[in-house]
Amino acid sequence: MARAITLVESTRPQHRALAQELLTELLPHSGRARRVGISGVPGVGKSTFIDALGVMLTSLGHRVAVLAVDPSSTRTGGSILGDKTRMERLSLD
């Protein structure tokens, strides 16, 4: 997943054709996903809420993916985080 994201975001000419090929293969499989954005100040309970919501959804038979981004990253403008430690119950499902 990380390699695919890097490839698609790359500005290198040699990556453009590969990124287009990847997106062409994935696009037919992308129509059924629901996307939800959660935002808030640090400490407000975003990870706790996502954990509880995710556990509820997986208990109903749904599949859940979490992509957590920190937009305050000065180097990248939005680093992708690994919040598995904050979403312990969901990481077990």
Curated annotation (Swiss-Prot):
One of its GO terms (cellular component) is cytoplasm. It holds the Pfam family MeaB. GO terms for molecular function: GTP binding; GTPase activity. PANTHER family: METHYLMALONIC ACIDURIA TYPE A PROTEIN, MITOCHONDRIAL, METHYLMALONYL-COA MUTASE. Belongs to the SIMIBI class G3E GTPase family. ArgK/MeaB subfamily. This is Uncharacterized protein in mutB 3'region. It comes from Streptomyces virginiae.
